């Protein structure tokens, strides 16, 4: 899958990500988009997927949802961070 079909969720407003997904579905004629998030952004990723499905692209469906734990090196040693991948298809 092309990297352009991946949305990395961070600190931007939720609707920015929703708009990016809607734009990719409409302009790139892609049928599959992956939403990725880690840590505190996981709840925002779920909100983004739900807003996209219920308000903008009603025929979008969840193809796959992956949960994982990633180990990150920080100042205080290694820490575990949860991550999610939500695959939307149309």
UniProtKB/Swiss-Prot annotation:
This is DNA/RNA-binding protein Alba. Binds double-stranded DNA tightly but without sequence specificity. Involved in DNA compaction. Pfam families: Alba. InterPro entries: Alba-like_dom_sf (IPR036882), DNA/RNA-bd_Alba (IPR013795), DNA/RNA-bd_Alba-like (IPR002775). Its main location: cytoplasm. GO terms for molecular function: double-stranded DNA binding; RNA binding. NCBIfam families: DNA-binding protein Alba, PRK04015.1. The keyword DNA-binding applies. Keywords: Acetylation, Chromosome, Cytoplasm, DNA condensation, DNA-binding. GO terms for biological process: chromosome condensation. It comes from Picrophilus torridus (strain ATCC 700027 / DSM 9790 / JCM 10055 / NBRC 100828 / KAW 2/3). The keyword Electron transport does not apply. It is found in: Cytoplasm; Chromosome. Acetylated. Acetylation at Lys-11 decreases DNA-binding affinity. GO terms for cellular component: chromosome; cytoplasm. The modification N6-acetyllysine is found at residue 11. Belongs to the histone-like Alba family.
């Amino acid at each position: 899958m092309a990297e352009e079909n991946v949305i990395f969720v961070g600190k931007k407003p939720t609707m920015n990500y929703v708009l990016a997904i809607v734009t990719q579905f409409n302009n790139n004629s892609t049928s599959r988009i992956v939403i990725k998030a880690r840590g505190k952004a996981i709840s925002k990723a779920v909100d983004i997927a739900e807003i996209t499905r219920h308000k903008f692209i009603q025929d979008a469906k969840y193809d796959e949802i992956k949960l994982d734990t990633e180990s990150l090196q920080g100042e205080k040693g290694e820490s575990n961070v949860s991550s999610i991948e939500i695959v939307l298809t149309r």
